[in-house]
């Protein structure tokens, strides 16, 4: 299996724009993905990004897996390696809705360049808009995830601890 890693710099005061190498894949990235998928039977693309990116480009359809790893910081690679090697299951759920194309986001015509905000979605911001108005425009819905799991909380008993005149019992 081949791994292709696509990265973007985005974050506070540095959002993506609808341009090649930002929201859109660059020509070099498209060329790289096409070459890798032509030489390898299986290809996975990892997106090290801080905001959404166009995941609908045809070159990505030839890839067997895509994973948004977001920006995990200097130790985020350890978690990605654990997922890739099967040590842990990628049981998280998507915290955003990813539309098929940027035009599907109602706020996209008003993004950037203005010194004011236009809240054209009214109360239907983010996933609420897509669940209410445009379900057919969703590529990956809010809450989407590869696997689901259950968690169990257990209580651990601790002995009494005397601190001054106070007594605490922890469970």
Please report, for each region that a protein language model flagged, where it lies by residue:
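C-terminal non-catalytic regions of proteins with extracellular/luminal or membrane-system context
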Residues: 1-171
